[in-house]
Design a protein with these regions (language model features):
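Mature N-terminal segment immediately following signal peptide/propeptide cleavage
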Residues: 29-75
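Carbohydrate-binding surfaces of carbohydrate-active enzymes
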Residues: 44-47, 57-62, 75-76, 81, ...
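An acidic-aromatic substrate-binding cleft motif
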Residues: 30-49, 191, 204-214, 222, ...
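Bacterial Sec-dependent signal peptides at the C-terminal "C-region" and cleavage site
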Residues: 15-31
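Hydrophobic alpha-helical membrane-insertion signals
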Residues: 51, 154-166, 219-222, 230, ...
Length: 452
């Protein structure tokens, strides 16, 4: 037994040495790696979400970037957020971004883009629905009745009547005649109400390619004109935040997009319309219908959002990172499969919010599955880096001990790029209650932060 153990250990050493002796430009020796640990390059340091939530000025940019540099920060993500006064994506905004990139370059820091005015990604601070009114997200709401009387309460999208063998479409008849008895399933299209959060508009349908193309044009092409010469250099990439396909309408509502029924029929060979009740009740071949429905949504979300976004970034030398709507599982109506979406990222990412340990399916810190999913996706797709947006809403009382235990837990599971949530330009007024803490001069421990 002893000689087998010795042989096994010797084999391990041979493999370890052979792996670590593979030359990498500039990092091909133990001494150079050790030196880099002592003083990491900017790409191996953390980069917080730098919250622009005030009237932004060159003086504020210069002062805070220098402060970040002095405290060991390697870069920032320019993150517009509530409280912002400088008009988003205006010429003034883009000029300030240019100044931040130039100043970051002079400090040997990275200046990443964040693709939205707050979140979730996709509506471009209201510019997308303003320029494309039909981009608004929708939902299909079901109401069940025992009779139908004229006039109908609304103009339904679809009316089904239950029969002995399934369901029949009586939409046209229901608009001109009453049905005194039976089982009727009425489906209505719902659209969200305008909201200040979405710039006075509504969220958009990310299962439509033309919506994504409008978003990329309005957002990333604007940045490309202003700072595109630094794409892939001082500006390494772009962060998407919580894009999702949540249906509008609340209770008894399913996802809807104009291509849904045609895509479903082409993929599965039968008409989803006549099987919609199976998405609400355990009737018919409901398990197969639900699987096929959510698989279709996933195809639409990947094909019309994730892939074109990823392709744009690849073409323009940007690393596509960020994350989808949290990592609760399973909630397919929000994001059918986070791991499948992560395949279309140059740096797959997650959210790890708050400061409470939990291992449940809806957990943040403690959700091992979420971290291992992105590490696995990165490994399978040949990507080296994985990102975590960490510490958000941890509270003003979060300690260094808390920060280290959360960070260490993520690192040991495979995260290798830490994105702190958040670093505020200002905390005046209500801003101080926007998911604190802040990795900035506002914290009493900031002077010691470089040690951590």
């Amino acid at each position: 037994m002893k000689k087998y153990l010795i042989f096994g250990f010797a084999l391990f050493l041979v493999c370890f040495i052979s792996q670590n002796c593979r030359k990498q430009p500039g990092r091909d020796s133990y001494s150079s790696v050790l030196a880099e640990f002592k003083n990491p390059a900017s790409e191996f340091r953390s980069a917080p979400l730098w919250v622009w939530n005030d009237r932004i000025t060159r003086e504020k940019i210069e002062t805070q970037l220098a402060d970040f540099k002095a405290h060991g920060i390697g870069g920032v993500f320019i993150h517009p957020r509530p409280g912002l006064i400088t008009p988003y994506l205006s010429e003034e905004w883009l000029d300030l971004c240019r100044y931040a990139v130039d100043k970051g370059k002079s400090l040997e820091m990275k200046v990443w883009l964040y693709d939205e005015n707050s979140y979730p990604s996709g509506f471009a601070g209201g510019h997308v629905p303003a320029e494309m009114p039909d981009a608004a997200g929708k939902g299909l709401q079901m109401t069940k009745k025992g009779k139908l009387q004229l006039p109908l309460d609304s103009s339904p999208f679809l009316v089904l009547r239950k029969t002995a063998s399934g369901f029949e479409d009586i939409t046209q008849q229901a608009r001109t005649q009453s049905f005194p008895e039976g089982e009727f399933y009425i489906f209505e299209l719902k659209q969200g109400n305008p909201s200040p959060w979405y710039g006075g508009f509504t969220y958009v349908d990310l299962m439509r390619r033309e919506v994504t193309e409008k978003f990329l044009d309005v957002t990333l092409n604007a940045y490309k004109k202003a700072i595109g010469d630094e794409f892939g250099a001082t500006v390494p990439g772009v962060f998407q935040d919580e894009p999702n396909i949540l249906p509008v309408g609340g209770e008894n509502t399913i996802n809807f997009t104009p291509l849904l029924f045609d895509k479903f029929k082409a993929k599965w060979g039968y008409d989803l319309r006549l099987n919609l009740p199976s998405l609400f009740e355990e009737i018919g071949d409901w398990m197969a219908v639900r699987h096929n429905f959510y698989a279709t949504l996933l195809d639409l979300f990947i094909g019309n959002w994730a892939k074109p976004y990823y392709d744009y970034c690849t073409k323009n030398k940007l690393a596509f990172t960020g994350h989808y709507w949290e990592h609760e599982w399973p909630i397919p109506r929000l994001s059918p499969d986070n791991m499948a979406m992560a395949a279309y990222a140059h740096m797959p990412g997650i959210d790890c919010l708050m400061n409470d340990w939990s291992q449940g399916p809806h957990a943040q810190f403690g959700n091992t599955r979420a971290v291992k999913e992105i590490r696995s996706a990165a490994s399978q797709m040949g990507q080296l880096r994985t990102m975590s947006e960490t510490y958000g809403a941890g509270g003003w009382d979060m300690t260094f001990f808390d920060q280290k235990r959360i960070g260490d837990w993520e690192f040991v599971l495979g995260v290798n790029f830490l994105n702190q949530h958040l670093s505020y330009v200002t905390i005046k007024g209500a801003r101080k209650r926007d998911h604190p803490l802040s990795f900035s001069y506002h914290e009493p421990w900031w002077q010691a932060y470089r040690l951590l």
